Amino acid sequence: MKNNQCSKVGKVNFPKHTGININMMPFIMGDINSIPKEYRCYKDIINSCNIHSSEIGKIGYLTITESFVNKGKPQRRGGIHTEKTPTHSWGGDDGGAWGGKSGLFMASNISDSCQIWNYHVDVPGLGGDCSHLRDKLGKGIKMSSNELYWMTDSCPHESLELKNDCVRQFFRLVTSDVGVWYEKHSTKNKLGVNPGCKIIKENKFKNAS
């Protein structure tokens, strides 16, 4: 494991929540018109990602989750994991701190709802699982509200149980180095922008690979 796998990018402001729920929707990075109008309210956060020039014009993947979450429940996938799996990349890892060419960006409007560790996991478990590393990772970094973070797809993180009932807004932008796109678990772009990788139609958790 090595560090320099995550860092703060800067403050962001979330738009008024409207119940958006999209996952890994493909769009053309640098072209806001490739994103359906109802999601363009996140334009300022997308621009804050300061995507590397080598990624402009390539396919990126947008996730926005706006939902009510009960106290004591995580909004998203629980357990420590990486975005990459043993067989597929999920944003890439150029091995350096923010300013690199690949990786992914995340933000939330609720503090302490996600925890990240500034480490590189060479070989995660099935589905990116890193629960076996919990004792070795030590204290993580709890993400602050309205703060944009960059990380590689080798950076372990977990969605945390929320301290109070709330409406949580979650934003993620994954850059182009994605190995596969799971059709059953992802959102198609109604403007016709297709994934820039292999499309898998089966359940992604079938083999958790």
Where are these regions (language model features)?
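N-terminal auxiliary "cap/dimerization" subdomain that precedes the catalytic jelly-roll/cupin core
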Residues: 1-59
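Hydrophobic alpha-helical segments and helix pairs
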Residues: 38-97
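Catalytic core of non-heme Fe(II) oxygenases with the double-stranded beta-helix
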Residues: 73-145, 181-185
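A residue-level signal for beta-strand positions that form part of recognition/binding surfaces
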Residues: 11, 103, 168
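Catalytic core of Fe(II)/2-oxoglutarate
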Residues: 130-208
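Structured loops at beta-to-helix junctions and adjacent beta-edge loops in soluble globular domains
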Residues: 65-67, 83-85, 107-110, 152-154, ...
